[in-house]
Amino acid sequence: MNTFSQVWVFSDTPSRLPELMNGAQALANQINTFVLNDADGVQAIQLGANHVWKLNGKPDDRMIEDYAGVMADTIRQHGADGLVLLPNTRRGKLLAAKLGYRLKAAVSNDASTISVQDGKATVKHMVYGGLAIGEERIATPYAVLTISSGTFDAAQPDASRTGETHTVEWQAPAVAITRTATQARQSNSVDLDKARLVVSVGRGIGSKENIALAEQLCKAIGAELACSRPVAENEKWMEHERYVGISNLMLKPELYLAVGISGQIQHMVGANASQTIFAINKDKNAPIFQYADYGIVGDAVKILPALTAALAR
């Protein structure tokens, strides 16, 4: 048996649901999808869900992860084994841990390859900070996986599909974290997974102010702006959602233009599937040039304006 009898899917990020659903179609005969609202339920059915389970009734001061108890109960009630697919977001990984505990299931994070043999999943993912690929065969009846962005192509919606909708009512967990306040994050909506052209900046750009030069290039060629992990996590020059690398975005654009990025393996794992890589770096020995199809050795602050002017003609 090279598929599971059923798979359970949940995504806290709507843009990640299509790829998870495509993976679910390849890995199981029946697809169950947990959703948070009616609109997500309609989308899930159009993407291939046989059954939609709407999570309902959570108080405003509780977090989505507190649904883990009723989600696990629902999964157990409908089969003695199964596969759970979640995005490798922060919330996805936290929920995976909670579901793994409740289902007595093995949990594997950041999966990049999944196969099924004899009803058991074999998972490959990066280990040792991206220096190697680990392979794990999951022996527990249930398997809980968080999936790296770009592992599957996005499923295409089909409005003619039909499915059954159910409601899963909130049950307060015995122990939970209560949210006391919410602060909106200042962030521009972006879906880098779908971008054809990506301009990505590293610390070699020099300063937060110099990122405007990359933004002007993006505007000239219709690209999306991304960054390396140090730019987002260390310098705080850009938001977390835009950094490319092993623990976040895994992109497959037609063009990846790396500006001031050294090219460490942890970053390149997220960019190496690009059709064409163009690098700009003042260090001729930077590892990025080992991956690049084209490269310019020089100061990005001087090169970007000239490149923008040439491409804007």
Swiss-Prot record:
Alphabetical GO biological process terms = carnitine metabolic process; fatty acid beta-oxidation using acyl-CoA dehydrogenase
Which GO molecular function, any one, fits this protein according to its record? electron transfer activity
Q: In which pathway does it act?
A: Amine and polyamine metabolism; carnitine metabolism
State the disulfide connectivity.
none
Chain positions recorded as FAD binding sites: 255-283
Q: What is an example of a Pfam family matching this protein? A: ETF
Q: Which UniProt keywords apply?
A: Electron transport, FAD, Flavoprotein, Transport
Superkingdom field: Bacteria
Concerning its family, UniProt says: Belongs to the ETF alpha-subunit/FixB family.
Q: How does it assemble?
A: Heterodimer of FixA and FixB.
User: Which function does this protein serve?
Assistant: Required for anaerobic carnitine reduction. May bring reductant to CaiA.
**Which NCBIfam families does the record associate with it?**
PRK03363.1
**Name listed for the protein in its UniProt record:** Protein FixB
Instruction: State the encoding gene.
Output: fixB
